[in-house]
């Protein structure tokens, strides 16, 4: 299927909805006090996986007449992942800047505790405050969701394809 044969508007909308699901998950984890838990990234990855699977199935049924090849499912998953990452990055910048006044204090406290536990030097611990910014957090999450989502898409595409891949 040529790149022009995708319904890009529908794919972007699916990605935006997936991004909002990721934001809702982040908000719930933050309010529950588990956002900084070492395992919270697994929750985010699980939400991303669900978004890819549900989004690909919906797109297949609605725009592909129930049939999708491996390469098509892979592209759909990547679009969902990158769109999710963009929405979540924007959320990070806005929420850290305006809505979560204690985010930096919590992040610095936890980062410092982890650095001490890993026996990092006092200089490295002191540099945490200078190097962590909302933009770096946002870009890091965009990259993480895009790369992890692409890998998840590669695997889920194997099970979501409904016809022989042509390309």
Describe each model-derived feature in a short phrase:
Residues 90-117:
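Functional transmembrane-helix hotspots
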Residues 9, 13-17, 75-84:
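Alpha-helical transmembrane segments of multi-pass membrane proteins
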